[in-house]
């Protein structure tokens, strides 16, 4: 916690005021959910140096520093788990790494961003982009500042992670085209966006 909250008590749970103090504790695993990039990267790297495995849902830090973090985890012989960083914990990462490991992948297609998914669904029913976004914000499906979602940044982070797993090669930050849904001006069908393709065999 960053400040005392007079309404709630942590009970017997130890509350730390500095996120890095957790590394001075006797812990078996670090669960990183602070978000952001730089502090998260430092915290995760420091955990690996102390031979502490890490679980994270932070797609942004994996997008920016994934190669470094995976290497640090491997060099220190600890696990680095990140299932919740893509598709809200739906077991897509485990599925690709293990259950489908023997398959040959040619491409990855899908709707990876929740707010965009909702907005496109509304547009498919005839609602305009602006009205769909407003409706999503009013009902808590989109942030007050939806830029991260509707400009494709969130989806780019996720597709980079999945690409690294499937093709064994990350998509370097800022080296591939990112286009969100904010330029869609008329109702559109899902089939135009995420039509899956089957290649024989």
Regions found by a protein language model. Give the residues of each.
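Conserved small/polar residues in nucleotide/adenosyl-binding loops
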Residues: 191-197
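ADP-ribose/adenylate-binding Rossmann-like module
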Residues: 35, 50-64
């Amino acid at each position: 916690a960053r400040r005392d909250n007079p309404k709630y008590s942590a009970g017997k749970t130890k509350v730390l005021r500095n996120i890095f103090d957790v590394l001075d504790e006797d812990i078996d695993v670090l669960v990183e959910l602070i978000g952001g990039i730089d502090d998260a990267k430092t915290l995760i790297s420091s955990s690996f140096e102390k031979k502490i495995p890490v679980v994270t849902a932070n797609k942004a830090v994996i997008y920016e520093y994934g190669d470094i973090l995976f290497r640090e985890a491997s060099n220190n012989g600890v696990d680095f788990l990140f299932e919740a960083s893509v598709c809200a914990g739906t077991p897509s990462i485990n599925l690709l790494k293990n259950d489908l490991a023997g398959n040959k992948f040619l491409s990855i297609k899908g709707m990876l961003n929740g707010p965009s998914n909702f907005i496109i669904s509304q547009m498919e029913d005839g609602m305009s982009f602006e009205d769909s976004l407003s409706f999503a914000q009013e009902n808590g499906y989109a942030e007050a500042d939806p830029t991260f979602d509707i400009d494709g940044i969130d989806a780019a982070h996720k597709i980079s992670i999945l690409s690294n797993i499937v093709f064994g090669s990350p998509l370097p930050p800022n080296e591939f085209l990112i286009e969100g849904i904010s330029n869609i001006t008329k109702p559109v069908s899902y089939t135009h966006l995420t039509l899956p393709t089957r290649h024989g065999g």
